């Protein structure tokens, strides 16, 4: 399949990558929409790449993906083939305190990875996603709607969860 990577120097590259197969707790999505965030623009111009494990790792870009489930790995219980989903942009470890409270962006594990930055994102024909990061897209919304709200809405929602948790 084809995918887009961000090598820097004000360029993007269209590359050939393998179609992944879902493992335990994972789903394979056929991408229907994947928007471009300001972070992506800054990465293209090398103004925002991060450092160390938080840096862009040369993977398929796109942390605002939306698609349809085409394969389900073992252990998945919520999603089925044909489901329309938005993908939250951070895959946490699922076991640290932040993840257990639903705040994956605050995951403290070295395994925390952002789609399109540390693991392949949505700018390809297919995306391998953790079932835990997928949110069913309500029928009135289009795939483009889902892609446009995936990063910004998810970040705001997690901020509200964190603020509520700290008040109690």
Task: For each feature predicted by the language model, list its residue ranges.
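Short structural boundary motif marking the start of a folded domain
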Residues: 1-4
